[in-house]
Design a protein with these regions (language model features):
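Catalytic-domain carbohydrate-binding cleft regions of carbohydrate-active enzymes
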Residues: 1-285
Length: 285
């Protein structure tokens, strides 16, 4: 329904993104969306392209649009303590807090805090940064990763949200995360916003949530599991669902068994609401 989406972990430079899209065009293979994954940014929580690797994102996106390709960008809800936005967000209570110990909720190449999208001011702040640094360059869609959120320390009793203690309200996190971008895009006049998100909760469908099944292994067993996952997502009221074609990790592109799996997963993907290729393939050169 939404065409074919090209994605991988990850495109490291502007030139790499354009090289892939141009090759699709040369081969006359239809491409609807290309996805730029994580760590394209200067720092977690800056929500902007790293100019060293993406020196002219607007020119890149303009060329992609000329080819008929829309652009999706990965967003993480994490703010590193060295981010340009950390101090302001911390002072304004726009981040999830801990009621004891160090105020760090994730450690991923640094120490980070998660944004608190249950706070309306947080939703407005994050959307404004996305407007300034992504939408202004022409980015069409957002990939809302880490949406659970993925706490490094799972002592849930210590986390405090705007809406209350985590043990009482944490499940609403992915819905409010989706709402952040849905509301912003609606204000722009986009009639039916749709964004990819790694987690959902009751009511997420009202915020344009396209959920995918996460980082699943590249095996036939997990291909079979996708049938169950997709059906259950639909029964939960969320119609927009997809999976990583080929699975996310463990697939070697030179392995005939993986090549067979990839072909079969493509066949399955053609009947999903969104046909999206993604993964972290071996070998890593």
């Amino acid at each position: 329904a939404m065409g074919f989406w090209q994605c991988k972990l990850r495109y490291q430079t502007q030139d790499e993104v354009l090289t892939i899209a141009r090759r699709y065009k040369e081969l006359n293979i239809p491409l609807s969306v290309i996805v730029i994954d994580f760590f394209h940014w200067t720092q977690q929580g800056d929500w902007r392209f790293d100019p060293e690797y993406f020196p002219d994102p607007k020119a890149m996106i303009d060329e992609l649009h000329e080819m008929g390709v829309r652009v999706m960008i990965s967003i993480w809800p994490t703010v590193d303590r060295t981010s340009v936005n950390y101090e302001e967000m911390s002072e304004r209570d726009l981040l999830i807090r801990t009621d004891r110990g160090l105020n760090v909720t994730m450690e991923c190449w640094g120490m980070q805090c998660f944004i608190d999208p249950t706070n309306p001011e947080t939703r407005e702040f994050v959307w404004q940064k996305a407007m300034e640094n992504y939408r202004s360059h022409g980015v069409d869609l957002f990939w809302l990763d880490e949406a659970e959120p993925e706490y490094t320390v799972q002592d849930f009793d210590i986390y405090r949200y705007y809406d209350g203690p985590a043990n009482e309200c944490a499940n609403e996190y992915p819905a409010r995360y989706s709402q952040t971008f849905f509301d912003g895009m609606k204000k722009e006049g986009i009639e039916n916003p749709l964004n990819l998100v790694r987690c959902a909760w009751a009511g997420s469908q009202r915020y344009g949530a396209l959920v995918w099944s996460g980082d699943v292994p590249s095996t036939f067993t997990y291909l079979r599991y996708q049938l169950t996952a997709g059906l259950n997502m639909g029964l939960a009221g969320i119609a927009w669902w997809t999976a990583d074609i080929g699975g996310f990790h463990g697939g070697n592109v030179h392995d005939p068994a993986f090549q067979e799996l990839l072909m079969r997963w493509f066949q399955f993907g053609a009947f999903c609401p969104v046909m999206r290729l993604h993964g972290d393939r071996d070998p890593h050169y």
